[in-house]
């Protein structure tokens, strides 16, 4: 079995065998040159130091894992009791990929994240990004039922 982190920061740290330094931005302690060194060795591709190019390289590598995975395992920001829906908030789109491309999706979360109805969810979804990153809303809000 191969486990692959899909959050970009966590993916970089997994490749580097390095612990996270921040809960929201886990690889913030690494320079782009350090990330480039890791990608060159682990991806076995020519070294790049341009950030858009490195992001594209990571997307290409991760997409291969998404489409061949038998199972995607994620957390959930919220679960709706009324519908059985899971809600995942990301800024990279990895939540949608891990919940839809693998044959099986397993969401693991605590009871404190269960909300009664979709209406209750609408209130909480506006609060989450403001308190986590200061954003009005995250780039990707994925609800899966």
Where are the language model's segments positioned?
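The feature marks the mature, well-folded catalytic cores of soluble enzymes
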Residues: 1-145
């Amino acid at each position: 079995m191969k486990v692959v982190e899909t959050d970009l920061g966590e993916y970089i740290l997994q490749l580097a065998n390095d612990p996270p330094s921040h809960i929201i931005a886990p690889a913030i302690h690494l320079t782009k040159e350090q990330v480039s060194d890791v990608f060159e060795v682990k991806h076995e591709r020519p070294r790049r130091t341009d950030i858009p190019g490195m992001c594209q390289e990571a997307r290409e590598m991760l997409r291969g894992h998404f489409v061949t995975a038998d199972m995607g395992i994620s957390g959930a920001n919220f679960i709706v009791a009324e519908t059985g829906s899971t809600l995942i908030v990301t800024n990279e789109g990895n939540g949608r990929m891990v919940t839809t491309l693998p044959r099986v999706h397993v969401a693991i979360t605590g009871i404190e994240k269960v909300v009664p109805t979709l209406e209750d969810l609408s209130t909480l979804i506006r609060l989450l990004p403001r308190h986590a990153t200061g954003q009005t809303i995250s780039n990707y809000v994925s609800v899966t039922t």
